[in-house]
Regions:
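Nucleic-acid substrate recognition interfaces
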Residues: 2-206
């Protein structure tokens, strides 16, 4: 075993580097959270909400992705119910995403939506079933077509960028935005929301 001696100052800097960085990717990830025993736990994520002011074309793209996500969610939920009724089994999110890939061959309009958002809709179906079987919520229900308020989540964190009064989102490009100051950090995902009054928002999870 090799023993390395270093000054107290250098030792402190090494500890701080280990706590605040991802040693595999060598990227800054922010402070970690520790439990009562001093052991590291999952880092707390925080969401920041922005008001979006999309153009007419961007609104059409958002609404199209919302409709596609609702369609995929309802379709996968229907398949889940039929499979569970017949065999007492359920599909994983991975299996549903494979079905989604085949669906795009005969439903080409799905290709015009955010692909990551459609995959996330499959994950939402799986999570809804898991929460139901754990008795954490009721049985999953279908999303209504005429529902005014709706949202979809995209997980393309590397494609999401924020600048002063602007946010760049997958498939939409730069959109004018207003809201509080968002600190620099790794963006995990963004949820695009359309309110019942027709306003658009983005919740950025970091």
């Amino acid at each position: 075993m090799k023993i390395i001696f270093m000054s107290p100052k250098k030792a402190c800097l090494s500890i701080l580097y280990a706590l605040f960085t991802n040693t595999r990717k060598n990227e800054w990830i922010g402070p970690r959270v520790f439990d009562v025993w001093g052991l590291p736990t999952k880092r707390i994520l925080k969401a920041y909400k922005l008001r979006l002011y999309p153009t007419v074309e961007q609104q059409a793209r958002i609404d199209h992705t919302l409709d596609c996500c609702r369609f995929v969610f309802n379709h996968m939920l229907d398949r889940q119910q039929k499979i569970y009724t017949r065999r007492g089994e359920h599909m994983s999110a991975y299996d549903m995403q494979k079905v989604l890939t085949r669906m795009k061959n005969y439903l080409p309009w799905l290709r015009d939506a955010d692909s990551k958002a459609l995959k996330y809709a499959c994950c939402q179906v799986e999570d809804a079933y898991k929460h139901f079987f754990k008795k954490q919520c009721g049985f999953p229900h279908f999303k209504k077509k005429r529902q005014c308020a709706a949202s979809y989540t995209t997980t393309k964190g590397t494609s999401i960028h924020i600048e002063q009064r602007q946010v760049k989102l997958p498939l939409l490009g730069w959109i004018e935005a207003r809201g509080g100051k968002i600190p620099d950090g790794v963006i995990k995902r963004a949820t695009i929301q359309r309110s019942a009054t027709g306003k658009y928002y983005a919740s950025i999870l970091m």
